[in-house]
Design a protein with these regions (language model features):
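Short amphipathic, positively biased membrane-proximal segments
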Residues: 1-287
Length: 287
């Protein structure tokens, strides 16, 4: 009889209805969360006060395309990133992690490394693999030794609390794990592999001027990565899922997250409560 495999993430976390799943993003000074129809963010400003704002999401209406494999992932990613301008307008105190000077330095370094790889390495796939890994530099430099790692832990702890016990459980986010199976860290491996393969195919089959075709291949690569990410969340016991979550968990526990204080969790709680109030008004979250 095979021993039951120990779960990597919070054991008490039940699978929530899909419409109840919340997304989030660590800010440099707080937390952004979003649900089916709204976003909310809470930050601690320079005076130490918690400032909160919320608003409606811009939903992409693409008809049947919204539910097609590959395309649906791009739509969801687009919706998540589309809230950023709204957050900037609604909460001027918010600071995005990518604004960190280390992220800018990392982006420059990644560009240089990718350029060197294209000149020095013979195989296209090797060039693209090095470029893809180097592309992680901005995120790694932002998280390493910065407050962003704390906020990157507040988001999964708050989400796991809500998914396991509803709105009342958000106050107990401190007892939940800072690693989450739907954290963006679990998208890293699929994204590296899919974009490396996609860019290799694109450079091999299409001319440099075939911008349209190469753009389509790049979009499909990202869509494929999101499909792998979603599959892994649905079937965590599958060998592929274990590999994806193993890499993601190692990143989350190793350097991408750092245990937050109670003061930090209060900011996350403020963001979650603002989001839940907004969604409750529209009835977009089910019991």
């Amino acid at each position: 009889m095979r021993a039951r495999r120990r779960p990597r993430y919070s054991e008490g976390m039940a699978e929530p209805p899909r419409s109840n799943r919340l997304g989030g993003m660590a800010l440099a000074n707080g937390l952004l969360v979003h649900g089916p129809g709204h976003w909310a963010a809470a930050v601690r400003d320079e005076d130490g006060r918690v400032v909160v704002a919320s608003g409606r999401k811009h939903l992409f209406r693409a008809g049947p395309l919204t539910d097609l494999p590959f395309a649906r992932g791009l739509v969801r990613l687009g919706e998540a990133f589309a809230v950023l301008p709204s957050v900037r307008r609604g909460l001027p105190q918010a600071r995005f992690a990518m604004e960190d000077r280390r992220a800018v330095a990392g982006a420059v370094a990644a560009t240089v490394v990718a350029a060197i790889a294209r000149r020095r390495l013979r195989w296209v796939i090797a060039q693209e693999a090095v470029g893809a890994v180097a592309g992680l530099a901005p995120a790694l430099l932002t998280l390493r030794g910065s407050r962003s790692a704390v906020w990157h832990a507040v988001e999964p702890k708050s989400s796991a609390a809500y998914e396991s016990g509803g709105a009342d459980e958000v106050a107990n986010a401190d007892v939940h794990a800072k690693e989450h199976e739907r954290c963006g860290s679990n998208l890293i491996l699929p994204l590296l592999v899919c974009t490396t393969i996609g860019n290799t195919i694109s450079r091999t089959l299409f001319r440099r001027r075939a911008l349209g075709a190469r753009t389509v291949v790049s979009a499909l690569s990202i869509g494929a990565a999101v499909e792998v990410f979603s599959f892994s969340a649905r079937r965590p016991e599958h060998p592929l899922s274990r590999l994806v979550h193993g890499v993601g968990h190692a990143m989350q526990s190793g350097f991408a997250t750092r245990e937050p204080s109670q003061s930090d969790l209060l900011v996350g709680r403020a963001a979650m409560e603002a989001l839940l109030r907004a969604e409750e008004r529209d009835g977009t979250l089910t019991a």
